[in-house]
From Swiss-Prot:
Its EC number is 1.1.1.38. It catalyses: (S)-malate + NAD(+) = pyruvate + CO2 + NADH; oxaloacetate + H(+) = pyruvate + CO2. The record marks 271 as: Important for activity. GO terms for cellular component: cytosol. This is NAD-dependent malic enzyme. It comes from Acinetobacter baylyi (strain ATCC 33305 / BD413 / ADP1). The active site is at 105 (proton donor), 176 (proton acceptor). Belongs to the malic enzymes family. Gene3D superfamilies: Malic enzyme, N-terminal domain, NAD(P)-binding Rossmann-like Domain. InterPro entries: Aminoacid_DH-like_N_sf (IPR046346), Malic_enzyme_CS (IPR015884), Malic_N_dom (IPR012301), Malic_N_dom_sf (IPR037062), Malic_NAD-bd (IPR012302), Malic_OxRdtase (IPR001891), NAD(P)-bd_dom_sf (IPR036291), NAD_malic_enz_proteobac (IPR023667).
């Protein structure tokens, strides 16, 4: 079973017919089957008489979608279309991308994860549970997709800012892969969501009689890492060239897993590296628009977990690329967590935090600060020009913090990136008011435009969906065997090149969602070029590379079918 290419030049030869064909989401056309196809595939009477175009189907679906009043039911409705007719699903999403992205992914996907067992309808992807650890190869062989090229995998322990959702975390790989297709043109026949079920420490789920996961506390330590290794090794055997995206693993596991496997498999961690790439791309664009480089900015983070430190490390790398030494770059980055500013004399720092700790002598001249140096202390004394929130805690960018930030620079950059919307460090409307409209803002979740003193401010969403679809497309088009730091840096610079702010100082920081497919293609090209330069992809001309990108870019159109015997 495959719908791996999408062209009307050649028909697709398939053996399925009747109800079986209608039950295959990759192949089902519903009311769009032609008269000839209805005859050849035993479909007469199984669907209504009228033959519709995909445009007509999309219009009907959108009308039905509009009948739902709340976002979670809209999400359930769209997932039902996805599970019955994937081509129609992506046509509908493409027709209304900006409207529907918040429904199929953040913020609505957060509630969908919390209620996964409540709203479960139909199978999608695979669940690999710890009790089945002796049968991993069999589980992977049960997948009918032969040519999987992109996998998003989670263990459900740190879902957005919502914590441990057990197997409910499957909503994230499903949503992410929907965006790989809708934004990056990767055929749904090439994608596979995977959830690793190692139990849950969420007592509410353990007590829930309809929770569908393994009802045990999470395994940990060597037992956990050995199981993860079994899963990843099995994936490598089944689909040796697939890109693996790690998604929403807990901080204690995310960086060790990335460190262990990034030089063995073609893989990356979107929470660490994808978030970093889109954030750095946004900062490069904002700096260029002000006639500066990123190395001229001073940056303060609220949140020093794997995501925050991942962004910080990529900022340091970009500053070094712009001419600073490593030490000079690190001196311009301040990391604040729940224990205050991270300094070198603090105990119990994680390895990835220690490299970003500020020197003790830096803060010794700050005078009247408490032993725990607060975010406000850092903003007052370090005088940052950029404030980035990845804390998962709402409201911590207070009015005093933002007003103090705005005293130090003409156009402060404020990026409250925590997801979902309920976890954002500050509301864009408040930031605009507190800075008298001077702040450049990018958020992790979508927000409506803000009207302030008669001017409408669009709020750019610093969403990883600007980055990871292009990375996936670039990896596939080039045949890259690894995801290197240079490839990630290339994605940041490609995104910065697309910023409307570079043409108009009053424009938005990031491109419109409506343009995201073109952005993904540009990112794919730069990522693929970097892969070739790093020697992890075969050498090819720019012309061939561009042809590969266009060839791989799937569009939701129906193909003609011809029947063949089994």
């Amino acid at each position: 079973m495959t719908a791996e290419t999408n062209t009307n030049k050649h028909p697709l030869y398939i053996p399925y017919a009747g109800y079986t064909l209608l039950e295959l989401p990759l192949l089902n056309k519903g009311s769009a089957f032609t008269q000839e196809e209805r005859s050849h595939f035993n479909l007469h009477g199984l669907i209504p008489h009228v033959i519709e175009t995909i445009e007509e189907q999309s219009q009907r679906s959108y009308q039905q979608y509009g009948a739902f009043n709340d976002d979670i039911n809209k999400h359930i409705y769209l997932r039902n279309i996805q599970d019955t007719n994937e081509t129609l699903f992506y046509r509908l999403i493409n027709d209304h991308l900006e409207e529907m992205m918040p429904i199929i992914y953040t913020p609505t996907v957060g509630e969908a994860c919390q209620r996964f067992s409540d709203i479960y309808r139909r199978h999608r992807g695979i669940f690999i549970s710890y009790p089945d650890r002796e049968h991993i190869d069999d589980i992977l062989q049960n997948v009918s997709k032969r040519n999987v090229k992109v996998i998003v995998i989670t263990d459900g322990e740190r879902i957005l800012g919502l914590g441990d959702q057990g197997i409910g975390g499957m909503g994230i790989p499903i949503g992410k892969l929907s965006l790989y297709t809708a934004c990056g043109g990767i055929s749904p026949a090439y994608t596979l969501p995977i959830t690793i079920d190692v139990g849950t420490n969420n007592q509410q789920l353990l007590n829930d009689p309809i929770y569908m996961g393994w009802r045990q506390p999470r395994i940990s330590g060597d037992e956990y890492y050995e199981f993860i290794d079994q899963v990843l090794t099995g994936i490598r055997r089944r689909w040796p060239h697939a890109l693996i995206q790690f998604e929403d693993f807990a901080q204690k596991n995310a960086m060790p897993l990335l460190t262990k496997y990034r030089d063995k498999f073609c893989c990356f961690n979107d929470d660490i590296q994808g978030t970093a790439a889109v954030s750095v791309g946004s900062l490069i664009a904002a700096s260029r628009a002000a006639g500066k480089q990123l190395k001229d900015q001073t940056i303060t983070f609220l949140g020093a977990g794997s995501a925050g430190c991942g962004i910080a490390e990529q900022i340091v790398a970009q500053m070094v690329a712009e001419g600073l030494t490593d030490a000079q770059a690190r001196a311009r980055v301040y990391m604040v967590d729940r224990f205050g500013l991270i300094t070198e004399n603090q105990p119990n720092l994680l390895d990835f935090q220690r490299k970003l700790a500020q020197k003790a002598e830096v803060v010794s001249d700050w005078g009247n600060v408490e032993e725990v140096i607060s975010l406000l202390d850092v903003v007052k004394n370090a005088k940052p020009t950029v404030l980035i929130g990845v804390s998962g805690q709402p409201g911590l960018f207070t009015e005093e913090v933002i007003r103090t930030l705005a005293e130090n620079c003409e156009r402060p950059i404020v990026m409250p990136l925590s997801n979902p919307t309920s976890r954002v460090e500050a509301l864009p409307s408040d930031v605009i008011q507190w800075t008298n409209g001077r702040a450049l803002i990018a958020t992790g979740s979508p927000f409506a435009p803000v009207n302030y003193q008669g001017k409408l401010y669009n709020i750019s969403q610093c969403n990883n969906s600007y980055i990871f679809p292009g990375i996936g497309l670039g990896v596939i088009a080039s045949g890259a065997k690894r995801v290197t730091d240079n490839m990630l840096m290339a994605s940041s610079n490609a995104l910065a090149d697309c910023s409307p702010l570079l043409q108009n100082p009053n424009a938005d920081l990031l491109p419109a969602i409506a343009d995201i497919q073109d952005v993904s293609k540009r990112i794919a090209f730069k990522v693929a070029k970097a892969a070739i330069e790093d020697g992890v992809a075969l050498n090819m001309s720019d012309e061939v590379l561009l042809q590969n990108i266009e060839k791989e870019f799937w569009k939701p159109k129906y193909r003609g079918y011809k029947r063949v015997p089994f």
